[in-house]
Amino acid sequence: MIVTTTPGIEGRRISAYHGVVTGETIIGANIFRDIFAGIRDIVGGRAGAYESALASARETALSEMQDRARQLGGNAVVGVDLDYEVINNMLMVSASGTAVSVE
């Protein structure tokens, strides 16, 4: 499945729009405690465990969004936007875009 932040896919024609699709995931408060407890893994000013947790959450949100696009009959998602929001000591990662069929 093609996933892009752009409104179209160069060299491909959008033949159908299937609607907005989203995917969300939440990292709970315990993950923050665990990450900060393991802060000693910081190398070069970067927290590896924290980056890994964020990457995993982002991939989960994107995967969920792609699954929803497939359910609607799409083979691509355009106009993808990723948002990160802190809610009551939890981090929500959400992905949204438009499911489309491309030729």
Swiss-Prot record:
Q: Which Gene3D superfamilies match?
A: Hypothetical protein apc22750. Chain B (3.30.110.70)
- Superkingdom in the source lineage: Bacteria
Against SUPFAM superfamilies, the record matches this protein to: YbjQ-like
Which HAMAP family did the record assign? UPF0145
Family of this protein:
Belongs to the UPF0145 family.
**Any idea what this protein is called?**
UPF0145 protein Pden_3965
**In which organism is this protein found?**
Paracoccus denitrificans (strain Pd 1222)
